[in-house]
């Protein structure tokens, strides 16, 4: 039912209030808002020219409808044009009906830049936000790259492309080596698995003792013993290659094969053999203990250091299996068995990689190679191109001199040695043209190798400092937080750690909001 308000007639208590569809003669048009619009009235829930009150992370401002109407595609522009309160609530995080204020749980610093955008139509990059956080905020408020000012657009695009590797050029940045809280949280989550496990408290202590050399005095002693065994195994392998041991074992092997017996029982020196058995027993103890104490079996087999431990003992057991398989097939098969055993013995060299568990530098080197595959690929490409070019030139200049440059593939060795500036001197050019080609090859190698090596070195420095910082953070966390867990009940669950993690994140968000710019006593109009 349509009701009209006539001049001189007061209907203050009449509900619902409605919009006057046709202005009276002699009166200016005025729009009134219905407090309780009916379902069929089609009346807007707020005036179209009403200022928009917003609260972004504690910063309160008022934006005029005229400023928002210039950018109807943005989030605030769509909020201003919302036809109903339900539609408006979908665009904000909360709405205060009493104050008619919209709340957004977003970065307050970016919001101040957003206000500047509504005034000028240009968005400027904020140095206080990383490029990805800035992009997320811009996407949330409905701004694209076209909204960026011309003075900031090129810089933003450049930072977005170089941000993942920004520490390559500025590796001395303190924040670049700070350990990520998620990395420490992953360790805590792994240890939380012991809460529901059998003998979880004891297993947790033993696991920290074996995995973290700085956890306690027993862990330091265990690390020293492990390093000593690895070094003893490597020393025994090197001593075994000395000529006197080779001659003695070769004579014993010939006698054993002639007698139709396996040469494996007499080839090794008794002292070296006992030392090898002791090292194998220790390595097997380490692998089995870590497997039994690991919080997650799947993660155990995915860890590179654990795979190195398995490879270090695998040749010994493969040799035993080969001896059992061929032990009853006569002396003729012992020759084939010897070749297999030699291959397995060669795999013992991987034991030196066990030192990576106790060396921050080796772990940093592995991380560097893992994250430098692009640079390594570029280096190999440069070397391949240079070797191919200079090998062809050297072959053309030296093929008539009979000094080792007979074919282009034969010149590849010379090109590789020259470009890497090693210079063995086994093959050298003798003609003037060949020497000029060699000079160009050496100079080109210096330039080509130096370019990627600098980037790889910066990455190694970054990962080394980051690894040291992470170890210190985890060690401090172990001594403080994990000791509290150990002294408490064993019913520590992953859910409790997730709750604590969310609490810490909320605390960080609160700190961020507390750092927001101070707001004026009353909302300002834009």
From Swiss-Prot:
Residues 240-270, 323-337, 396-408, 429-435 are extracellular. Pfam families: BTB_2, Ion_trans. Residues 1-217, 294-304, 359-373, 465-526 are cytoplasmic. A motif (Selectivity filter) lies at residues 421-426. GO terms for molecular function: delayed rectifier potassium channel activity; potassium channel regulator activity. The keyword Transmembrane applies. PANTHER family: POTASSIUM VOLTAGE-GATED CHANNEL SUBFAMILY S MEMBER 1 (PTHR11537:SF61), VOLTAGE-GATED POTASSIUM CHANNEL (PTHR11537). Belongs to the potassium channel family. S (TC 1.A.1.2) subfamily. Kv9.1/KCNS1 sub-subfamily. This is Delayed-rectifier potassium channel regulatory subunit KCNS1. It comes from Pongo abelii (Sumatran orangutan). The lineage of its organism: Eukaryota, Metazoa, Chordata, Craniata, Vertebrata.
């Amino acid at each position: 039912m349509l009701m009209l308000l006539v001049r001189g007639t007061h209907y203050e208590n009449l509900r619902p209030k409605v919009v006057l569809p046709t202005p009276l003669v002699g009166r200016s048009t005025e729009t009134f808002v219905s407090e309780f619009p009916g379902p069929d009235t089609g009346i807007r829930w707020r005036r179209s020219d009403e200022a928009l009150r917003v609260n972004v992370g504690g910063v309160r401002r008022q934006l005029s409808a005229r400023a928002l109407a210039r950018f109807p595609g943005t989030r605030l522009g769509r909020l201003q044009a919302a036809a109903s309160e339900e539609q408006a609530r979908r665009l904000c995080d909360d709405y205060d009906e009493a104050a008619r204020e919209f709340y957004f749980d977003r970065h307050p610093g970016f919001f101040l830049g957003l206000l500047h955008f509504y005034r000028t139509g240009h968005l400027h990059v904020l140095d206080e936000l990383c490029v990805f956080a800035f992009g997320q905020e811009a996407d949330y408020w409905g701004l694209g790259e076209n909204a960026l000012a011309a003075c900031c657009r090129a810089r933003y695009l450049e930072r977005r492309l170089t941000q993942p590797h920004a520490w390559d050029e500025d590796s001395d940045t303190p924040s670049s080596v700070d350990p990520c809280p998620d990395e420490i949280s992953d360790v805590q989550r792994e240890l939380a698995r012991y809460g529901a496990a059998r003998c979880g408290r004891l297993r947790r202590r033993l696991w920290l003792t074996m995995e973290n050399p700085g956890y306690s005095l027993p862990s330091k002693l265990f690390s020293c013993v492990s390093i000593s065994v690895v070094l003893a195994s490597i020393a025994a392998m090197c001593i075994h290659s000395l000529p006197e041991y080779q001659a003695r074992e070769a004579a014993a092997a010939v006698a054993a094969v002639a007698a139709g017996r396996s040469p494996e029982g007499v080839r090794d020196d008794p002292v070296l053999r006992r030392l090898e058995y002791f090292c194998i027993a220790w390595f097997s103890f380490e692998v089995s203990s870590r497997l039994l104490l690991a919080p997650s079996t799947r993660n155990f087999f995915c860890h590179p250091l654990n795979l190195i431990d398995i490879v270090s003992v695998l040749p010994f057991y493969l040799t035993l299996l080969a001896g059992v398989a061929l032990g009853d097939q006569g002396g003729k098969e012992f020759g084939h068995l010897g070749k297999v055993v030699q291959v397995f013995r060669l795999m013992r060299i991987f034991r030196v990689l066990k030192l990576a568990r106790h060396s921050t530098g080796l772990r940093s080197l592995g991380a560097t190679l893992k994250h430098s595959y692009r640079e390594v690929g570029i280096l190999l490409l440069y070397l391949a191109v240079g070797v191919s070019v200079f090998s062809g030139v050297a072959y053309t200049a030296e093929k008539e001199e009979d000094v080792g440059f007979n074919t282009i593939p034969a010149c590849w060795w010379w090109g590789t040695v020259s470009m890497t500036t090693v210079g063995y001197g086994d093959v050298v050019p003798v003609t003037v043209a060949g020497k000029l080609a060699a000079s160009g090859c050496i100079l080109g190698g210096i330039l080509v190798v130096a370019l990627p090596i600098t980037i790889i070195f910066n990455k190694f420095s970054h990962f080394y400092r980051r690894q040291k910082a992470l170890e210190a953070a985890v060690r401090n966390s172990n001594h403080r937080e994990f000791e509290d867990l150990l002294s408490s009940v064993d019913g520590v669950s992953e859910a409790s750690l997730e709750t604590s993690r969310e609490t810490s994140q909320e605390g960080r968000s609160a700190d961020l909001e507390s750092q927001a710019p101070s707001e004026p006593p009353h909302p300002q109009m834009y």
